[in-house]
From Swiss-Prot:
Positions annotated to bind ATP: G129, T130, N131, G132, K133, T134, T135
Classification via Pfam families: Mur_ligase_C (PF02875), Mur_ligase_M (PF08245), MurD-like_N (PF21799)
Catalytic reaction annotation: UDP-N-acetyl-alpha-D-muramoyl-L-alanine + D-glutamate + ATP = UDP-N-acetyl-alpha-D-muramoyl-L-alanyl-D-glutamate + ADP + phosphate + H(+)
EC number: 6.3.2.9
Protein name listed in UniProt: UDP-N-acetylmuramoylalanine--D-glutamate ligase
Primary gene name: murD
InterPro entries attached to this UniProt entry: Mur-like_cat_sf (IPR036565), Mur_ligase_C (IPR004101), Mur_ligase_C_dom_sf (IPR036615), Mur_ligase_cen (IPR013221), MurD (IPR005762)
Pathway assigned in UniProt: Cell wall biogenesis; peptidoglycan biosynthesis
Biological processes annotated in GO: cell division; cell wall organization; peptidoglycan biosynthetic process; regulation of cell shape
Function: Cell wall formation. Catalyzes the addition of glutamate to the nucleotide precursor UDP-N-acetylmuramoyl-L-alanine (UMA).
Length: 504
């Protein structure tokens, strides 16, 4: 349960949702606890006390002294960067003493291994990527349910993995399949996690301050794959394809790709455009049509004997209820993951047609006078906004800006030039966005509030356009969180609707 330690003394750093879950899990299994948080009274302190947990609490700045006094295991909450000025010396001190540093995902992996010794053998699906994680995770969970499996969805999507596992154990209802949304923060402190199937949806700049650079961020994403994990890879993303196993390796893990073009290799997925219809398709080797659906180690043989590939139509992309080409890619990834753990195709395709999407993720909240109002407040990085613009593939008035987290905004220029009628700029990093978009030829306007930006965008939009809130930035410079930003956007659209004599 805790590596080679029975009931170690654990230092839990950070008492957010994940830290609270770790503390409760460790206490449940007899560990002694020291809990530290930079806040003197973190909100979850009362919840931990109410749970009847015996622990020592230390509030205030972190210091290496926290690992003194018999600490045998350090648990790091995902919001805390090991590179942070106050945390790096503590982490270094722990490692110098040979004290393991785990995050919640490693505790979860160790727990599954311990349960496995008693015969519990669930399938585990893991989803990571800069954008699209929550949609793909929710959709994969639904698909597994439609295939008749008892499913637990947890991780970055909430609830915490250890809380969900505790609930399942207490209810004597352990799931057949775990579907986990995992952030780079969670993966960074994982060591033995090895899911049955996993995907990296995409890798673009995000959280560079936390990881110290893009290479470290991408490497953290790659920790989603264990030695035998089926790798579901986005072939349209060169950074993702760096994790493709070498074709010549005899012991290479299985791999399958998805993308927005036609797939060319047996078992891969993509889009076929025919007579004005885009189809979700699977590539099938005609000579091995009766082979199992799960991808095989085939790349080396294909080089010598190219297969006779046919494209099997799965469903029209327009039959999906989630809009945009990026969501077609998410759907293909979810389907590929479910197939990779051996689930039958028919119920999965029904699930794809059923899924309605997640709030604040390219969500059309209204259509007024032929103009779509689209809430993509969850689009907190450049890659998300590029995906929203290219995915919607319609003329748009974009509302963007906020806390840019040190990102390079230059990749926005091409899609803005292609799709945008105008861009409304808000928030702290509006000047940086203006500089990046200055040569696009698209009108740019600064606004002090989101409400003003929505009104200006509405006045400019033409029938067939979208007014798209996709900020490419975090929200905390102006709002409590991205959901609060979405609420303000919706309220502004509601006001416009009322003036037009209608409601949302």
């Amino acid at each position: 349960m805790f590596g080679d330690r029975q009931r170690p003394m654990v230092l839990v750093l950070g008492l957010g949702e994940s830290g609270l879950a770790i503390a409760r899990w460790c206490a449940r299994h007899g560990c002694r606890l020291r809990v530290a948080d930079t806040r003197e009274t973190p909100p979850n302190l009362a919840a931990l006390t109410a749970a009847g947990v015996d622990f020592e609490f230390v509030g205030g700045a972190f210091s290496p002294a926290l690992v003194d006094g018999g600490i045998e295991l350090v648990a790091l909450s995902p919001g805390l960067s090991p590179l942070a000025e106050d945390l790096a010396p503590l982490v270094a001190a722990a490692r110098e003493r040979g004290i393991p540093v785990w995050g919640e995902l490693e505790f979860f992996a160790q727990a599954l291994a311990a349960l496995g010794a008693n015969g519990y053998a669930p399938k585990v699906i893991a989803i990571t990527g800069t954008n699209g994680k929550t949609t793909t995770t929710s959709l994969a969970g639904l698909l597994c349910e439609r295939a008749g499996k008892k499913v637990a969805v947890a991780g970055n999507i909430s609830p915490a993995m250890l809380d969900k596992l505790t609930e399942a154990i207490d209810a004597a209802a352990l799931p057949d399949v775990w579907v986990l949304e995992l952030s780079s923060f969670q993966l960074d402190t994982a060591h033995t996690f090895a899911p049955d199937a996993a995907t990296i949806l995409n890798i673009t700049q995000d959280h560079l301050d936390w990881h110290g650079g893009f290479a470290a961020y991408a490497a953290a994403k790659g920790r989603v794959f264990g030695p035998r994990t089926v790798r579901v890879l986005n072939r349209d993303d060169a950074e993702v394809m760096r994790f493709a196993p070498p074709a010549a390796a005899a012991d290479a893990p299985r791999a399958v790709t998805f993308g927005l073009n036609e797939p060319a290799a047996d078992g891969d997925y993509g889009l076929l455009r025919e007579n004005g219809i885009a189809w979700l398709v699977e590539a099938i080797d005609r000579d091995a049509a009766d082979a199992p659906a799960a991808p095989s180690r085939r790349r080396k043989q294909e080089a010598a004997n190219p297969p006779d590939i046919a494209l099997k139509r799965l469903m029209p992309a327009d039959a999906l209820r989630i809009r945009g080409l990026h969501n077609a890619a998410n759907a293909l990834a979810a389907y590929a993951l479910a197939r990779a753990i051996g689930l039958p195709a028919a119920p999965l395709l029904h699930g794809l047609r059923e899924y309605r999407g997640e709030p604040h993720r390219v969500e059309v909240i209204a259509t007024l006078d032929g103009v779509d109002y689209v809430d993509d407040s969850k689009g907190t990085n450049v890659g998300a906004t590029v995906a929203a613009l290219d995915g919607l593939a319609q003329r748009a008035v974009l509302i963007a800006g906020g806390d840019g987290k040190g990102q390079d905004f230059e990749p926005l220029a091409a899609p803005v030039a292609r799709w945008c009628r105008a861009v409304m700029l808000i928030g702290r990093d509006a000047p940086a966005l203006r500089e990046a978009l200055a040569d696009t030829g698209v009108p740019l306007a600064d606004h002090a509030t989101l409400e003003a930006a929505v009104r200006a965008a509405s006045a400019l939009a033409q029938p067939g356009d979208a007014v798209l809130l996709s900020p490419a930035c975090a929200s905390l410079d102006m709002f409590r969180n991205y959901a609060h930003r979405a609420d303000v956007f919706r309220s502004a659209v509601e006001d416009i609707a009322l003036e037009k004599g209608t409601t949302l």
